[in-house]
A protein has these predicted regions:
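Small beta-barrel nucleic-acid-binding modules, primarily SNase/OB-fold domains
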Residues: 1-170
Length: 170
């Protein structure tokens, strides 16, 4: 009901696709009718930075910093050529990976193999990106170098209620 009324967007993690078609159809209808978050007051984007999780310098943080980006469109988006950067000018060029509608990609500051992790989460490793633990801004640009979205955080880690990466959130 929330998706239908434009109060939420479709969001999927993992392989279970039981309700994907229904939720994407309801989202498309809400977008078409310009209700809720899809209204004229909002700036509709296909890709949105939803979470920033900088490392915590006061703890032995076993998980690397990351930024989560959601596909709010109703189509698969190829991320090849997109760039995620920060205020310090560090950049991460996305490889040739695709993100299905309603899914997210984790841009992790750790190292590893890019692709879908065991629990169905798409992960891209950007070891050249270091996020300032106190304040920073994430910038996402498309292959044409147009700004797609920004996400500024200040203070402690910024995350939504379901923004967890590898294990328990602190």
């Amino acid at each position: 009901r929330l998706v239908q009324e434009g109060l939420a967007h479709a969001f999927f993690i993992g392989p279970n696709q039981k309700h994907h078609a229904l939720l994407l159809r309801l989202q498309a209808e809400a977008q078409q009718h310009k209700v809720g978050i899809w209204s004229a007051r909002g700036r509709v984007r296909d890709l949105k930075i939803t979470t920033a999780h900088p490392a915590d310098p006061t703890q032995d943080d076993q998980y690397p910093s990351y930024v989560r980006i959601a596909n709010l469109s109703n189509a698969t988006i190829k991320l090849a050529g997109y760039v995620l950067s920060n205020e310090g000018g560090q950049r991460c060029l996305f490889p040739d990976v695709s993100m299905d509608p309603g899914y997210t990609v984790i841009a992790s500051s750790g190292s590893g193999t890019d692709g879908v992790a065991a629990k169905g989460q798409l992960v891209v490793h950007c070891s050249e990106l270091a996020w300032d633990p106190s304040e920073d801004t994430a910038f996402l640009t498309n292959p044409s170098r147009s700004l797609v979205d920004t996400f500024h955080y200040k203070g402690k880690r910024v995350r939504g209620p379901s923004s967890r990466y590898k294990g328990k959130a602190r």
